Swiss-Prot record:
It is found in: Cell inner membrane. F-type ATPases have 2 components, CF(1) - the catalytic core - and CF(0) - the membrane proton channel. CF(1) has five subunits: alpha(3), beta(3), gamma(1), delta(1), epsilon(1). CF(0) has three main subunits: a, b and c. Belongs to the ATPase gamma chain family. It holds the Pfam family ATP-synt. GO terms for cellular component: plasma membrane; proton-transporting ATP synthase complex. This is ATP synthase gamma chain. GO terms for molecular function: ATP binding; proton-transporting ATP synthase activity, rotational mechanism. Produces ATP from ADP in the presence of a proton gradient across the membrane. The gamma chain is believed to be important in regulating ATPase activity and the flow of protons through the CF(0) complex. Its main location: membrane. It is a peripheral membrane protein. One of its GO terms (biological process) is proton motive force-driven plasma membrane ATP synthesis. It comes from Burkholderia cenocepacia (strain ATCC BAA-245 / DSM 16553 / LMG 16656 / NCTC 13227 / J2315 / CF5610) (Burkholderia cepacia (strain J2315)).
Amino acid sequence: MAGMKEIRGKIKSVQNTRKITKAMEMVAASKMRRAQERMRAARPYADKVRAIAAHMSRANPEYRHPFMVANDGAQTAGIILVTTDKGLCGGLNTNVLRATVQKFKELEEKGQKVEATAIGGKGLGFLNRFGAKVMSQVVHLGDTPHLDKLIGAVKTQLDLYSEGKLSAVYIAYTRFVNTMKQEAVIEQLLPLSSDHFEADDGTPATSWDYIYEPDAQAVVDELLVRYVEALVYQAVAENMASEQSARMVAMKAASDNAKTVISELQLVYNKSRQAAITKELSEIVGGAAAV
């Protein structure tokens, strides 16, 4: 009977755990919908700003902002690492951290040092354990990204690039593909890249420049600030949508596994109970026969 009591305790414990994971699954599903709405609302703007910046990188404008000039003499690169503040989201953070480590190695093989900005507590903890130099950080963002909280930490890297102290600035985050799939990506933020310089049909587009009014410097200075803000905000929005999707899937898997464990324990309990009853009946029958 002691074994049966222990099994009942295990069943109760797993049932309580399943209630928690089921509740977390439902909360994550609700947050996921809101995060996806924010991400999808911001994505067209970010894509258009990225395309404009790509055109500018291929053109020969009358004014060239520091963000458009490659700092070939700099021996240090910057990486903005976007992760979550919380765990329980499957391999989401692991994948982007693995990609970041690979980027660190690639840059170091080229003789470049790396300085990082951490957005999210998980990334900050990893960078500290990894021994990377963290120049700025943002944690506890909550469920809604706010640009005013983000841009201060990112501006540290932008200022260093403008001063010619960084050779490039990259941003690492998890891009949302769909509810079941998210992918870790690392994009070059600075100098302006022409990677997205394509026509609508995917073929290389023709290079051309814009007409700037009232003057090129005023427009370009403002535009490139918006470019950085848009890409950083979009990266965080994509990462948050990916986080809630991954957490919902992970908690659903945990709930399903808990249900399986409960069924298996219930079967073991029933077998133990049946064996105990059979033993008692055998003892009663044996006693009656002896009398």
